């Protein structure tokens, strides 16, 4: 799009349905049939509308109700994400592999109206069915419904998403995000696009962005919103063990990574196995700090390394580093013109801006 839209309503009605309906929105590979499925933006928009009909017709007074997603990455995950939001629900992406103690704590806190699940057993299926069986629904429930004829804008500053922290300092906290918070992170994608503009052949199809990080991870969640709002294709992976097969079947130039994945890419590059990575040349780091030497090695071997710093509480839009040189590649990067920064006497970096969360759910002192 010519500018990064600020609402999901515009992203769907203007972007997906009018500006780039014939572009590829998603690809995913199915190993059992050895096929790559392609979904266009106009098809995605119709399925989002089906989900709106589905949720609004099966959940009384749906506005503000919590819809939990417990599933591996899939096209249905994407559809339910956008559909729940446009239905006026509060979306709660959850880590399906957490212990039952952690998961039950989060579910009790959220009090969901529905839990959408892929039906697989991640170690807690029996407990989940016993405690919440009446709320469990399949991920593809939307398919038998007609697309909603009308969509309506949601409250720009209303609670839209609850995303749980990793819980490194105890039980996870629910980070409250509004539409303003999440879509304000669009300036990060614009900054990345500007850095890549002179390096991409615009006569060819738009570069594919590969996603294998789970969608309950902030890095993947921001990718989902950013690429679809911009009209870029997203190649979906659901298991890191299928990484090499996925990127050969679905050529991808860009990929968001955490340190473990960056280190694995680094080993391939340094051992002369760059060909295993296909077209991949832009790893975008999010999460913890990366080893500067690893990043420098990648940059010296044709990779363009990007680092994004900013926890879930800032929608990943806190600080970005495009540096490829030895002096600066180990830094966190530069601040954004869209944010205010302050360093406290004890060294803590404080940030203020539209991307900063609304607060912690049911924990105002957190």
Where are these regions (language model features)?
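Conserved AMP-binding/adenylate-forming
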Residues: 35-39, 52-98
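Structural core segment of the AMP-binding/adenylate-forming
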Residues: 82, 86-155
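N-lobe entry segment of adenylate-forming
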Residues: 1-58, 63, 108
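Conserved AMP-binding/adenylation subdomain of ANL enzymes
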Residues: 183-208, 212-272
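Conserved ATP/PPi-binding loop(s) of AMP-dependent carboxylate-activating enzymes
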Residues: 334-337, 344-366
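Conserved pre-ATP/AMP-binding loop-to-beta segment of ANL
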Residues: 21-24, 146-164, 170-171, 199-208
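Gly/Ser/Thr-rich phosphate-binding loop
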Residues: 253-257, 266-327, 340
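Conserved AMP-binding A3 loop
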Residues: 38-42, 160-187
């Amino acid at each position: 799009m010519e500018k990064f839209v600020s609402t999901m309503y515009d992203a769907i009605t203007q972007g997906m349905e009018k500006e780039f309906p014939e572009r590829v929105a998603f690809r995913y590979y199915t190993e059992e049939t050895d096929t790559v499925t392609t979904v266009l933006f106009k098809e995605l928009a119709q399925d989002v509308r089906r989900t709106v009909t589905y949720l609004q017709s099966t959940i009384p007074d749906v506005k503000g109700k919590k819809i939990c997603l417990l599933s591996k990455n899939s096209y249905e995950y994407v559809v339910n994400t956008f559909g729940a939001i446009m239905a006026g629900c509060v979306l709660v992406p959850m880590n399906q592999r957490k212990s039952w103690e952690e998961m039950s704590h989060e579910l009790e806190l959220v009090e969901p109206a529905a839990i959408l699940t892929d039906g697989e057993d991640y170690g807690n299926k029996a407990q989940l069915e016993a405690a919440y069986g009446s709320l469990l629904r399949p991920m593809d429930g939307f398919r038998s419904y007609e697309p909603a004829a009308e969509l309506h804008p949601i409250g720009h500053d209303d609670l839209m998403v609850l995303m749980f922290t990793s819980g490194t300092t105890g039980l996870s906290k629910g980070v409250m995000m509004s539409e303003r918070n999440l879509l304000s992170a669009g300036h990060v994608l614009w900054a990345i696009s500007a850095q890549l503009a002179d390096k991409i052949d615009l006569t060819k199809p738009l570069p594919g962005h590969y996603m294998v990080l789970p969608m309950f991870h902030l890095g993947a969640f921001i990718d989902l919103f950013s690429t679809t709002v911009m009209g870029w294709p997203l190649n979906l992976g659901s298991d890191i063990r299928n990484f090499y097969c996925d990127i050969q079947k679905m050529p991808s130039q860009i990929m968001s990574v955490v340190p473990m994945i960056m280190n694995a890419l680094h080993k391939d590059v340094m051992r002369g196995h760059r060909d295993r990575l296909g077209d991949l040349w832009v790893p975008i780091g999010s999460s913890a700090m990366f080893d500067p030497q690893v990043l420098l090695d990648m940059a010296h071997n044709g990779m363009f390394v990007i680092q994004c710093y900013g926890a879930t509480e800032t929608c990943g839009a806190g600080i970005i580093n495009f540096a490829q040189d030895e002096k600066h590649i180990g830094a966190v990067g530069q601040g954004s013109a869209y944010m205010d920064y302050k360093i406290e006497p004890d060294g803590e970096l404080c940030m203020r801006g539209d991307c900063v969360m609304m607060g912690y759910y049911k924990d105002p002192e957190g």
